[in-house]
Structure formats: structure tokens, C-alpha cells
């Protein structure tokens, strides 16, 4: 029997991001978006719906990934596109309700790890075994 693939909802995305080491959340861009950060650096931006940037709400988040990884994911998945209002080379919009939970979690982890890899060595050390 084939294994059923589950999709994430907005609360599951939020909860998963907050479980990662050192993550904080805030709303610097208004009430319609939550950002998730490591050491003050944004790795994920979760749209809550409505607001001036998302009038026709479609569940999505923007995340930072390596440029070549963004290209690869966009080629393979129609639910991953260049991010709206972000540097399209480095950021992708992920329409998480159209993708498997496993893939969405992997993308969030990858984005989190990318930001950690850019931190100063002394700061990065506290995340190595997390």
C-alpha cells in the first residue's frame, strides 16, 4: 500500500520553525507576516494572509536558500517560485499546502542551516550540535 503524504498547515509551519535551535519570531513588516530569525537574521517569512502584500491569500512562506538550490527546487516543484518582495536569486516562496510535510520541513531546516553557516565562527559554534 502506498504511503499517504500529508501537507502542513500554517500552525504546523510556525511550530516547526520555532523548534529549530535559536529561533525567534517577530512581526517587523506588519500584522500580516511573521518572520523567523537566528541571531537576528531572517531565514523564513510566513505570510498570515490578507494585508497589503497578499490580498488573494495563498498559504506560503518565503525562505532564503542558496541560489543553485532555489533554481533546482523551482524547476522540480510548481509550488516553489521566486519570492515576492525579496531578492529572487536568494529567496523563494514556498506554497506549503501543495507540498509534502517532509519536503517543507527539509526546506525550512535548510534555510535555517544556511543562515547559521553565515554567522561568525564563535557564534556558529553553539549551533553545531543542535
Whereabouts are the PLM-identified features?
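Charge-dense, helix-prone N-terminal extensions
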Residues: 1-130
